[in-house]
Amino acid sequence: MTYQENYQKWVDFTGLPDYLRQDLENMDEKTKEDAFYTNLEFGTAGMRGLIGAGTNRINIYVVRQATEGLARLIESKGGNEKERGVAIAYDSRHFSPEFAFESAAVLAKHGIKSYVFESLRPTPELSFAVRHLNCFAGIMITASHNPAPFNGYKVYGEDGGQMPPHDADALTTYIRAIENPFAVEVADVEAKKASGLIEVIGEAVDVEYLKEVKDVNINPTLIEEFGKDMKIVYTPLHGTGEMLARRALAQAGFDSVQVVEAQATADPDFSTVKSPNPENQAAFALAEELGRQVGADVLVATDPDADRVGVEVLQKDGSYLNLSGNQIGAIMAKYILEAHKSAGTLPENAALCKSIVSTDLVTKIAESYGATMFNVLTGFKFIAEKIQEFEEKHNHTYMMGFEESFGYLIKPFVRDKDAIQAVLVVAELAAYYRSRGLTLADGIEEIYKEYGYYAEKTISVTLSGVDGAEQIKAIMAKFRNNAPKEWNTTAITVVEDFKAQTATAADGTVTTLTTPPSDVLKYTLADGSWIAVRPSGTEPKIKFYIAVVGESNEDSQAKIANIEAEINAFVK
């Protein structure tokens, strides 16, 4: 069906709400094509898109269609899955509560139990709720750190991790089989609340989550001595982190936490920031201002659904250093392993997990403590799968998992990135370095001196719409078929094609990769540096990752600059 035919189907539907009809009427031809040329697809983390009318937008009909697919998947299982039900949470975005209760209404029409949070909650708490309530699945309405015009829909499996590939593929099949999203039936929400089929949850689950999060901090004595007076500035960037982060920090003994109050209110427009993304230093503007006023040692920011955390640390000159996701991962891993080693609690079979595009510095740190590093595809569900595997086989003890995109998980009572846990570890880290008369910035430098000057850079290029999708395909094809034989005058030693599941050495030897197929290419160089390229699974972007190791910070930065210039020239 052409985009014009899809558009006309929506125009002809008489039950369309006024706000969506107005959206249709205001579309120019280019917008119309982008909104209707395809269906919003599930990526590494469910589906995410612009809010509005269209098959390639997120709206009540696309949400109903996705949930109808989930309901059919649940019914196909044939056991007690309907009774176990689905936990549903949502963030602070436009239409998030509506999408959550639309999902519950579709499930209820099928006689499927749902537990819906009474108000906004973090993604990690949804993951926890699935496990705590023994649900079959979970739905999180969020677009994570995307700008305000976006929303999204993530599906979780019974282990609390994002739905694994097998079930996700089955779910996609069920969703695609639904030809008319306008025909999806919904139950009356208030009636089903009264009958108990839709159950509203809240504080009781918060309390259980906060009980579990107590175990994240390793050294309570250290916190008692150096954490009480340590000044921390926290901002939830208008999102869900405010629901739990402040309480978790107070419970752990961090009494001098200052919150950026202008960003503590839920605001779907994220009015005080250009983008509510803690990866971007611009999101820290108000936190830096407050930090200077109160003399804060560390600034922490969580994204709207509180699964990612950004960190800035005080430097000797009084300015704040913005840490990369890889630097946060490295300093966390070093501290967790060292603290457990000092306490005599480091297991012999200790294991860490990271994505294939995250820094090798953490691998080197892990190995120095006798721990094993497991590399997985991008998407935290693959780390959740590893945790499940460790539990089933009893072969490794999970210590920490992370992705360079500012996602961390310490304790596996949650099976997705958890910024609340990460905030607690960052606060303890700051207390640890303070106890030594140092800052977190000093800690990063110590790691570089011990393990080498690792540096990384991620370049994200946004290519929207039909043309953008074609450009992304063309760039991937060019890298796959005509990539250079060297980068920065350094020979490529291995090319890993995760789509073909092959690793090809310079001498032509080919080995098979054991990870599931994924559209990622990675080039490892003779000096240990690497370049990776992949399309984003959730946004119209292509991402280039550069990772190097050098003799000094200047050496590493020069290598990155050279490789970045070569990538730009190659892509043109």
Can you say where each PLM-predicted feature lies in the sequence?
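Phosphate-binding and adjacent anionic-ligand microenvironments
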Residues: 292, 296-298, 319-321, 339-534, ...
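N-terminal small/polar loop signature for handling phosphorylated ligands or for N-terminal nucleophile
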Residues: 87-150, 251, 255-310
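Conserved phosphate/anionic-ligand binding catalytic regions in large, soluble enzymes, centered on
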Residues: 36-56, 143-146, 236-244, 248, ...
